[in-house]
Amino acid sequence: MDQARPSRRAAFVAAGGVFAAGLALAGCGGKPEQKSPGGEVSAVEDLMREHGVLRRILIVYRETAGWLAAGRTDFDAAALGQAADLFRAFGEDYHERELEEQHVFPQLQKAGGPVAAVVPVLLAQHARGRQATAFVRARCASGRIAPADAPALGKVLQDFARMYEAHTAFEDTVAFQAWRQSMSDKERETAGDQFEKVERSHFAGGGFEMAAGQVAQIEQKLGLADLARYTAGAVPAP
């Protein structure tokens, strides 16, 4: 049995848990998080801005998946491989394994409730994402994409982006908020300190700044850096 694929029952439970968690948080009267002294980044803000970097990689994946679907393989495959390398190092080995899986998820499971019931689904999605990352890295290792590989690679990129967009949206709006509300002010401060230590041990400095800089370079190489290119086209008159 594929351990990375949630069962239908798990998916049903997850769907109910997402809805119930949203209701629970909407009615929760927990204290609002105080700003860190000196303008320091809180643990939740740190997690969410890291998601911002990862979402920029998802944009790269969606755009290149569209090119592949159109039969185009003449773009910089090495840059796509670098995006997957960055997702592995920053998203999976650091953000997921060291922060979410070591700190956030155990606290959610300890607190119990509907959000805790969704943790197995989040973990399964982490595992599936690592499979996707390995596939992308392998297909881009030579610096070019073989035309025969284009359909499968495009599907993996598209499916991964779809999954991770839902995954990060749930974490940002439900899981991280439940995690924050499950802790005292002192525990939140301690979590922020722990996250900073983990970041320094991994990157010897600002991991977020490093990752944001790298994804900007990847966007430039692929011609995806201009924000205006994503502006929606003209909307027909109603």
Question: Which residue ranges define each predicted feature?
Answer:
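Small-residue-biased structural context
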Residues: 1-238
